[in-house]
């Protein structure tokens, strides 16, 4: 397992610099266009993507799904892998809360949902969520770091409410 992580880190170190855009305006306007990286959504943890579509944005995560019981969303979704998952959100992008020469502190809110399909049999997972996010949009690099509060309602494999849920994203913008 350790060798796999070493190869993954080497591959990431070689690929990420090739993906970083060389256009000057991409460094100063990280909220335009398309962002790609890693993150979590409603039930999904994996590859995160965000497409700006004014006045808002579509955000999605494709990755793995996990849960511990039939009580819906919760911290158990990060404990183990049960299958594959897709999370989709629509976010309303709001004006910056603060601006510095290094980053803009932006915020958004919206609604989303997620579907998880177990790979070893069992009941799929379905949940809906509200999203309220803080975005650190860096102005010297085409990066964003987003932290989201994400209260969710699990619909399958059982109805449950997760009022304390947080997710995060780290993306490169193109």
Tell me what each language-model feature is:
Residues 30-32, 41-45, 80-86, 105, ...:
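Residues that define the transmembrane beta-barrel architecture of outer-membrane proteins
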Residues 67-70, 139-174:
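Predominantly the C-terminal beta-signal and adjacent terminal strand-loop region
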Residues 52-143:
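Gram-negative (and chloroplast) outer-membrane scaffold detector with strong preference
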Residues 1-29:
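Cleavable N-terminal export/targeting peptides
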Residues 25-35, 65, 103-105, 128, ...:
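A membrane-pore/channel beta-structure motif
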Residues 20-77, 85-86, 173:
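Short glycine/proline- and aromatic-enriched beta-strand/turn motifs that initiate or cap beta-hairpins
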């Amino acid at each position: 397992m350790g060798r796999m992580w070493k190869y993954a880190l080497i591959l990431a170190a070689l690929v990420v610099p090739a993906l970083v855009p060389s256009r000057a305006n991409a460094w100063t306007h990280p909220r335009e266009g398309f962002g790609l990286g890693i993150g979590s959504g409603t039930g999904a943890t994996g590859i995160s993507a965000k497409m700006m579509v004014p006045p808002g944005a579509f955000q999605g995560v494709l990755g793995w799904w996990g849960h511990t019981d039939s009580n819906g969303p919760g911290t158990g979704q990060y404990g183990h892998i049960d299958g594959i998952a897709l999370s989709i959100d629509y976010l309303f992008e709001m004006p910056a809360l603060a601006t510095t020469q290094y980053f803009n502190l932006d915020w958004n809110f919206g609604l989303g949902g997620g579907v998880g399909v177990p790979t070893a049999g069992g009941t799929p997972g379905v949940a809906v969520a509200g999203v309220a996010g803080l975005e650190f949009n860096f102005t010297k690099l085409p990066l964003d770091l987003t932290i989201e509060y994400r209260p969710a309602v699990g619909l399958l494999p059982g109805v449950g409410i997760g009022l304390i849920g947080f997710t995060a994203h780290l993306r490169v913008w193109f």
